[in-house]
């Protein structure tokens, strides 16, 4: 049986470290810390990539962009998202919508949410209203609550655009 829709979910987390900004959804956000990561550490785009890959059972971001590979040192996570989108399109799928939640006490995400939505929609060539970015705190519980790091969750709905050749 073949369906014309698939769903996927992703999660990413990074600890805070030295720096003066974090990348969130492809947007540079000023912050008192950076993140400890091999690439630019964009938890939003990393979670979104994992959701997209998971929807088609294509593995995870670590398999496609291993931290052991020097090519990805300090890489712009927009590259990762475009690669994942290309894999979907090659197989006849597109992102129908994406729903992303950032979990942190700081930085405040709200003032940057529209810019993140615009960046993600542009990278995926989808409508702005197909991308949701929102934030929550963990009520000062756990590592995000103590301000030690940042996390993101993403859910996607994929739609079939073409039946791949057999």
From Swiss-Prot:
GO terms for molecular function: 2-C-methyl-D-erythritol 2,4-cyclodiphosphate synthase activity; metal ion binding. Its cofactor is a divalent metal cation. 4-CDP-2-C-methyl-D-erythritol 2-phosphate binds at residues 12-14, 38-39, 60-62, 136-139, 143, 146. InterPro entries: MECDP_synthase, MECDP_synthase_CS, MECDP_synthase_sf. Pathway: Isoprenoid biosynthesis; isopentenyl diphosphate biosynthesis via DXP pathway; isopentenyl diphosphate from 1-deoxy-D-xylulose 5-phosphate: step 4/6. Transmembrane segments: none annotated. A divalent metal cation binds at residues 12, 14, 46. The record marks 38, 137 as: Transition state stabilizer. Keywords: Isoprene biosynthesis, Lyase, Metal-binding. GO terms for biological process: isopentenyl diphosphate biosynthetic process, methylerythritol 4-phosphate pathway; terpenoid biosynthetic process. Its EC number is 4.6.1.12. It holds the Pfam family YgbB. Binds 1 divalent metal cation per subunit. It catalyses: 4-CDP-2-C-methyl-D-erythritol 2-phosphate = 2-C-methyl-D-erythritol 2,4-cyclic diphosphate + CMP. The keyword DNA-binding does not apply. Involved in the biosynthesis of isopentenyl diphosphate (IPP) and dimethylallyl diphosphate (DMAPP), two major building blocks of isoprenoid compounds. Catalyzes the conversion of 4-diphosphocytidyl-2-C-methyl-D-erythritol 2-phosphate (CDP-ME2P) to 2-C-methyl-D-erythritol 2,4-cyclodiphosphate (ME-CPP) with a corresponding release of cytidine 5-monophosphate (CMP). Belongs to the IspF family. Homotrimer. This is 2-C-methyl-D-erythritol 2,4-cyclodiphosphate synthase. It comes from Xanthomonas euvesicatoria pv. vesicatoria (strain 85-10).
């Amino acid at each position: 049986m073949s369906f014309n829709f698939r769903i996927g979910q992703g999660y990413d987390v990074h600890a805070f470290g030295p720096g003066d900004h974090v990348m969130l959804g492809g947007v540079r956000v000023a912050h008192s810390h950076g993140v400890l990561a091999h690439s630019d550490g964009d938890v939003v785009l990393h979670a979104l990539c994992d959701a997209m890959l998971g929807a088609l059972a294509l593995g995870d971001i670590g398999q496609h962009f291993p931290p052991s590979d020097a090519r990805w040192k300090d890489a712009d996570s927009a590259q990762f998202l475009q690669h994942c989108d290309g894999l979907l399109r090659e197989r006849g799928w597109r992102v129908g919508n994406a729903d992303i939640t950032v979990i942190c006490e700081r930085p405040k995400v709200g003032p940057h949410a529209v810019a993140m939505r615009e960046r993600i929609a542009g990278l995926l060539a989808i409508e702005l209203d197909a991308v949701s970015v929102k934030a929550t705190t963990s009520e000062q519980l756990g590592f995000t609550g103590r301000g030690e790091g940042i996390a993101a969750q993403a859910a996607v709905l994929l739609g079939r655009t073409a039946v791949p050749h057999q």
